Swiss-Prot record:
Entry GO CC: glutamyl-tRNA(Gln) amidotransferase complex
Quaternary structure and interacting proteins, as annotated: Heterotrimer of A, B and C subunits.
Gene name of the encoded protein: gatA
Database matches in InterPro entries: Amidase, Amidase_CS, Amidase_dom, AS_sf, GatA
Catalysed reaction equations from the record: L-glutamyl-tRNA(Gln) + L-glutamine + ATP + H2O = L-glutaminyl-tRNA(Gln) + L-glutamate + ADP + phosphate + H(+)
NCBIfam families: gatA
Pfam families: Amidase
Protein's recorded name: Glutamyl-tRNA(Gln) amidotransferase subunit A
Active site (UniProt): 76, 151, 175
GO molecular function: ATP binding; glutaminyl-tRNA synthase (glutamine-hydrolyzing) activity
Origin: domain of life: Bacteria
Example GO biological process: translation
Length: 483
């Protein structure tokens, strides 16, 4: 059963080939057996999962239907889950039990999904390798010496290892798409505001967006259907009708205009990944798409702008973790200043402290105009570049990452080298656009992905293209040895 996709599970539950309780039991056994090699879960909610599975079976027996009813899910450990530890991968929240469910968690529970647990992640979602977690690094199932990407590395590794068919993730600068590329999955970052952020512990509020990680575009469509929708509790949620994301998966690509930005193929891109992108473009051309070269002239400034804006917002968001209201509290503080200093110094890891300091510096009186305001101006220019490009093309294609997965620890002493791995993904966050990564082949036995970007609220188009591509390629069906 562990080889089944989410769509196959939906069909199997509907025709009573197996029950949700049987499926849940089998996957929990698999997690217990294999996850010690991967470290993809922080918390496994075995008792709760079996209870939810029995409840889903009862709902189905009573005549209820639904594609997600009784299907398994695990949540990235920054989505609040009532009564279950929500750690954000940090010592700071090691003992935090959420008093309510995040909107995404509540919506999927209402649809009848069974939560198997909470997945490992970079601390407070800050990282591209899942090495900064308080609970230890996550291993890539394709090669246990390599990183799975981040910050949703646990979510990606769990699905890639067939521990379950799909997980939730979040994407602030590529944290769904990059691990999807490095573990041979399909990962979708929706348009900013498409999925509620309520109950999702914030990293950078103007960039964060929740989305699905799964093996196929068809599965991502099913999961996004359950996650998306307006939420009055989230002031950044957009009141936009949610289409049936599965309805147009098989639509023709005849005449589809695809843009290939020349800036994507400069220095820093592994030439073997460039070859995989070109091969994917040829497949889409065979399906009727028309490809033309375009330009995104301000992309070269994206990393600099992102690594000012995101840390600035993080320094503000993380100021609430001070050892007073909640979070780690140091022992025997001498006074309030000592409480703040030691609680935060002990509770936050090195990478989080680094970004808080960068963000605080960028927002300080003497440097606000020089850094933060400039970064926001560049952000606007990047958005304008996309608006102009989408006048000429329907979607944009390119590499998801400049390199395949690297060895654990290889970039640990060089944060800039790790930041540069976000080169192709962060522009979608700065502009608020939807983006999808899909499996596109292998380099040295490690998976690589191709990224698609579309205009606002056109997730359906991305899913359609990825699904049609997956009908004529088999990259997404390949599984790592031993899993």
């Amino acid at each position: 059963m562990h080889q089944l996709t989410l769509a196959e599970i939906a069909r199997g539950l509907a025709d009573k080939s197996f029950s949700s309780e049987e499926l849940t039991g089998a996957l929990l056994s698999r997690i217990k057996q294999l996850d010690p090699q991967l470290n993809s879960f922080i918390t496994v909610t075995e008792e709760q999962a079996l209870h939810q599975a029995r409840a889903a079976d009862a709902r189905r027996a009573a005549g209820e239907t639904g594609a997600l009813l009784g299907a398994p899910i695990a949540h990235k450990d920054l989505f609040c889950t009532q009564g279950v530890r929500t750690s954000c991968g940090s010592k700071m929240l090691d003992n935090f039990t959420a008093p309510y469910d995040a909107t995404v968690v509540a919506k999927l529970a209402e649809a009848g999904m069974v939560t198997l647990g909470k997945t490992n992640m970079d601390e407070f979602a800050m990282g591209s390798a899942n090495e900064s977690s308080h609970y230890g690094a996550v291993k890539n199932p394709w090669n246990l010496e390599h990183v799975p990407g981040g910050s949703s590395g646990g979510s990606a590794a769990a699905v890639a290892a067939r521990l379950l068919p799909a997980t939730t993730g979040t994407d602030t600068g590529g944290s769904i798409r990059q691990p999807a590329a490095l573990t041979n999955l399909t990962g979708l970052k929706p348009t900013y505001g498409r999925v509620s952020r309520w109950g999702m512990i914030a990293y950078a509020s103007s960039l964060d967006q929740g989305g699905p990680l799964a093996r196929t575009a068809e599965d991502c469509a099913l999961l996004l259907q359950g996650m998306a929708g307006f939420d009055s509790k989230d002031s950044t949620s957009v009141e936009e009708p949610v289409p049936n994301f599965s309805a147009d998966l098989n639509a023709s690509l005849q005449g589809l205009r695809i843009g290939l930005p020349k800036e994507y193929f400069g220095a820093g891109l592994d030439p073997r990944i460039a070859e995989r992108v070109q091969a994917s473009v040829k497949e889409l051309e065979k399906l009727g798409a028309v490809v033309k070269e375009i330009s995104l002239p301000n992309m070269q400034h994206a990393i600099a702008a992102y690594y000012v804006i995101a840390p600035a917002e993080a320094s503000s968001n993380l100021s609430r973790f001070d050892g007073v209201r909640f979070g780690h509290r140091c022992a025997d503080p001498k006074d309030l200043t000592d409480l703040y200093k030691r609680s935060r110094g002990e509770g936050f890891g090195v990478e989080v402290q680094r970004r808080i300091m960068v963000g605080t510096y960028a927002l300080s009186a003497g440097y606000y105009d020089a850094y933060y305001v400039k970064a926001q101006q560049i952000r606007r220019l990047i958005k304008n570049d996309f608006v102009a490009a989408f006048n000429d093309v329907d979607v944009i294609i390119g590499p998801t990452t400049p390199n395949p997965a690297w060895k654990i620890g290889a970039k640990a002493g060089d944060p800039i080298a790790e930041y540069l791995e976000d080169l192709y993904t962060i522009t979608a966050n700065l502009a608020g656009l939807p983006g999808l990564s899909m499996p596109a082949g292998f380099v040295d036995g490690l998976p690589v992905g191709v990224q698609l970007l579309a205009p606002y609220f056109q997730e359906g188009r991305l899913l359609n293209i990825a699904h049609r591509y997956q009908q004529v390629t088999d990259w997404h069906t390949r599984a790592p040895n031993g899993f």
